[in-house]
A protein has these predicted regions:
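Paired small-residue
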Residues: 106-114
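Juxtamembrane helix-start elements in MFS-like secondary transporters
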Residues: 50-59
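Conserved MFS/SLC helix-loop-helix module at the cytosolic interface between two early adjacent transmembrane helices
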Residues: 68-103
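Helix-loop-helix hairpin linking two adjacent transmembrane segments in secondary transporters
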Residues: 145-172
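Extracytoplasmic
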Residues: 14-45, 52
Length: 172
């Protein structure tokens, strides 16, 4: 019985680490995309002047997707186990690759929206993993990491933009 508990705990910790790192990557992608939104709009509209509303579509759609994801995440978790639900969220998060290679602004917007869905689901599932698999004396540390994960991602982007700004914004 003790071996089974240790295996379950180690799997839970591994799942938590994967979800935490995934959310940090999501946050980095989100912050970088937000910081580069002017250049992204300029790129997709070939330098033409567009309504400020068009350039804000990304932020609004991602906010809507994240609200939707928070509501749907619990339902998906009830229908699937935490591992399968997390895999679904990670697959949705992979739509960031579609966004990077999108050929038009609207495909980019849809891909970012789906990616945001996955990111929000990951946040919900991290809390579930903490509650289910992390020992009570370690939960406060895990919860602090969950809370800090977005800021860690944003901090990484700030460091990268500070050190490599010319490289990051060139060749748009």
């Amino acid at each position: 019985m003790n071996t089974l508990t240790n295996v379950k705990k180690s799997q839970g910790i591994m799942m938590f680490i994967i979800l935490l790192l995934s959310y940090i990557v999501f946050a980095s992608n989100w912050v970088a995309g937000s910081n580069l939104s002017e250049k992204i709009v300029f790129h997709y509209f070939n330098g033409e002047q567009v309504s400020p509303m068009v350039s804000e579509v990304i932020n609004y759609t991602i906010t809507i997707a994240r609200i939707f994801a928070n509501l749907v995440a619990a339902y998906i978790l009830l229908k699937l186990n935490p591992r399968k639900a997390s895999i679904v969220a990670l697959v949705l998060l992979c739509f960031s690759f579609v966004a990077v290679f999108a050929t038009n602004y609207w495909l980019y917007t849809i891909a970012r929206m789906i990616m945001a869905l996955g990111g929000s689901m990951i946040m919900v599932y991290m809390n579930t993993v903490v509650a289910r698999f992390i020992a009570n004396d370690e939960k406060i540390i895990a919860s602090a990491l969950v809370t800090a994960s977005y800021n860690i991602g944003a901090g990484l982007v700030a460091i990268i933009f500070f050190l490599y700004k010319d490289v990051v914004i060139s060749d748009w």
